[in-house]
């Protein structure tokens, strides 16, 4: 008992040493265990993040608008779409079969109407005058306010362009009308040269409304094709054309008598139903829609008779006559066909002035003849069953059609076509892109001069001087075209004394 209580005894010293040694042996184990637990928790967190955030499936994105209309329609997948759900490998098929075939049901009229949630009645086609008269669809007619704004902007741009190019010798609307009216193959011999005295492109815009889509039968397409019908109305506009000419009596000798005639035709009101449909770009349709060889030969002969005064117009006519629904490379394009139903309304106001001394004004018979001729011209071109077919341009993005909206105002456009095109290009690209193009051209000039910087043969001083002159001239042109060059010369160096 005394040995235990006495700290100076040897047995008590041994017990104290053994207990202290045990505490010092177990004390370092706690930091190691904590370090291992911390590392393990970090690894687990990283693994959970990779699994659930990186390789996890993305949640379905909510729709932008939960309207009553979208909640009613449920997409039904066809049997053709079930095969696409199976996983595909990158090298499952050869490279020649990369483009998947389009099933015939995807271009069917019923499939298009079902996928776009548009209801249309199956149409019956009682024919009248060789024209099919379809029933209207059960879908409610739609307003075309946005379309009216788009068409109004397009017409306004055409009017502005026609006014800017009014003094152009080749691209003006006045020159085009004069050339068309004085066509020697269509103008009779008793009519002298026709002069256009006044043109008014109007100030109002057509209003489209009551748009509906119908399905009609078409033997060239599977399941028929779709056609859009819309009402168009244009009234209270000053769309007019005034001309002057002479009626020539060529008997018993040429120009035996001359009767001056002045006519003015104005559109008071136009209303009708516009039909729009798309013609697929197949080889058969492009063959049927392109003009015949006889028409092309007739156009070529008429261009030869005009002479060399309008070469640009003749080339444009040839391209337009040969283009049709087929591109210049021979690949058929999808075309837009539009026409008007026969129940259209075209009210004209015709004013006439005949004679030089004793003049007859507003002759009713002349007005009747002019109105009949205008109606016949309109019906021969855009009234059912005749349609106008326009090849749609390619909408694939290309660098040649890429532009940047200019930050500066559009400069004044001169009368020449080149100045008008260049001014429009400068305003579209902006000053920054124009400067970049000029700098690029200057660099090309310098690069062109590098080709001639080879060492000339020994003893040939003429070639070396020629190369030096070429390099010097190219550098001067490059400096002159450089828009970032600081004008003026640098100050002279100050000598250090």
From Swiss-Prot:
Residues 1-28 are lumenal. The chain crosses the membrane at residues 29-55. GO terms for biological process: mitochondrial genome maintenance; mitochondrion-endoplasmic reticulum membrane tethering; phospholipid transport; protein insertion into mitochondrial outer membrane. Residues 81-94, 440-451, 474-484 have a biased composition (Basic and acidic residues). It is a single-pass type I membrane protein. Residues 95-107, 284-302, 311-330, 462-473 have a biased composition (Polar residues). Residues 412-421 have a biased composition (Low complexity). Residues 56-497 are cytoplasmic. Pfam families: MMM1. The keyword Glycoprotein does not apply. Residues 60-107, 284-330, 402-421, 437-497 are annotated as: Disordered. Residues 66-77 have a biased composition (Basic residues). One of its GO terms (cellular component) is ERMES complex. It is found in: Endoplasmic reticulum membrane. One of its GO terms (molecular function) is lipid binding. Residues 140-393 form the SMP-LTD domain. The SMP-LTD domain is a barrel-like domain that can bind various types of glycerophospholipids in its interior and mediate their transfer between two adjacent bilayers. Belongs to the MMM1 family. Component of the ERMES/MDM complex, which serves as a molecular tether to connect the endoplasmic reticulum (ER) and mitochondria. Components of this complex are involved in the control of mitochondrial shape and protein biogenesis, and function in nonvesicular lipid trafficking between the ER and mitochondria. The MDM12-MMM1 subcomplex functions in the major beta-barrel assembly pathway that is responsible for biogenesis of all outer membrane beta-barrel proteins, and acts in a late step after the SAM complex. Homodimer. Component of the ER-mitochondria encounter structure (ERMES) or MDM complex, composed of MMM1, MDM10, MDM12 and MDM34. A MMM1 homodimer associates with one molecule of MDM12 on each side in a pairwise head-to-tail manner, and the SMP-LTD domains of MMM1 and MDM12 generate a continuous hydrophobic tunnel for phospholipid trafficking. This is Maintenance of mitochondrial morphology protein 1.
């Amino acid at each position: 008992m005394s040995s235990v209580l006495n700290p100076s005894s040897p047995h008590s010293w041994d017990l104290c040493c053994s207990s202290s040694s045990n505490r010092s042996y177990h004390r370092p184990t706690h930091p190691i265990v904590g370090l291992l637990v911390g590392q393990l928790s970090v690894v687990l967190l990283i693994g959970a993040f990779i699994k659930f955030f990186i390789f996890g499936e993305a949640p379905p994105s909510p729709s932008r608008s939960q309207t009553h209309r979208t909640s009613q329609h449920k997409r039904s997948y066809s049997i053709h779409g079930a095969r696409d759900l199976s996983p595909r490998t990158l090298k499952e098929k050869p490279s020649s079969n990369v483009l998947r075939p389009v099933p015939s049901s995807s271009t069917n009229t019923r499939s298009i109407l079902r996928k776009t949630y548009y209801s249309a009645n199956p149409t019956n086609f009682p024919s009248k005058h060789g024209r099919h008269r379809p029933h209207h669809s059960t879908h409610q007619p739609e307003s075309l306010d946005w379309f009216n704004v788009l068409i109004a902007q397009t017409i306004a741009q055409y009017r502005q362009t026609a006014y800017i190019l009014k003094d152009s010798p080749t691209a003006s609307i006045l020159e085009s009308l004069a050339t068309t009216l004085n066509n020697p193959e269509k103008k009779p011999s008793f009519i002298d040269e026709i002069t256009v005295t006044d043109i008014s492109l109007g100030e109002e815009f057509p209003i489209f409304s009551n748009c509906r889509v119908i399905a009609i039968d078409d033997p060239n397409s599977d399941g028929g094709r779709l056609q859009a019908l819309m009402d168009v109305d244009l009234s209270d506009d000053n769309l007019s054309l005034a001309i002057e000419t002479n009626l020539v009596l060529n008997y018993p000798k040429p120009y035996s008598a001359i009767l001056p005639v002045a006519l003015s035709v104005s559109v008071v009101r136009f209303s009708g139903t516009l039909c729009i449909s798309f013609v697929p770009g197949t080889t058969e349709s492009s063959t049927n829609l392109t003009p015949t060889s006889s028409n092309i030969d007739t156009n070529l002969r008429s261009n030869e008779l005009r002479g060399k005064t309008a070469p640009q117009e003749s080339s444009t006519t040839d391209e337009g006559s040969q283009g049709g629904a087929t591109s210049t490379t021979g690949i058929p394009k999808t075309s837009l066909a539009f026409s008007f139903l026969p129940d259209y309304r075209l009210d004209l106001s015709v004013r006439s002035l005949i004679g030089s001394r004793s003049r007859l004004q507003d002759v009713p018979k002349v007005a009747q003849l002019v109105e009949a001729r205008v109606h016949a011209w309109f019906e021969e071109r855009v009234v059912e069953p005749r349609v106008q077919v326009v090849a749609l341009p390619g909408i694939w993005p290309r660098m040649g059609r890429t532009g940047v909206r200019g930050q500066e105002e559009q400069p004044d456009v001169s009368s020449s076509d080149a100045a008008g095109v260049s001014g429009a290009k400068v305003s579209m690209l902006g000053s920054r892109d124009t400067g970049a193009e000029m700098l690029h051209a200057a660099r090309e000039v310098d690069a062109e001069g590098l080709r001639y910087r080879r060492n000339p043969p020994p003893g040939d001083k003429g070639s070396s001087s020629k190369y030096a002159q070429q390099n010097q001239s190219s550098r001067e042109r490059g400096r002159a075209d450089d828009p970032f060059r600081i004008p003026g010369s640098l100050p002279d160096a100050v000598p250090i004394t």
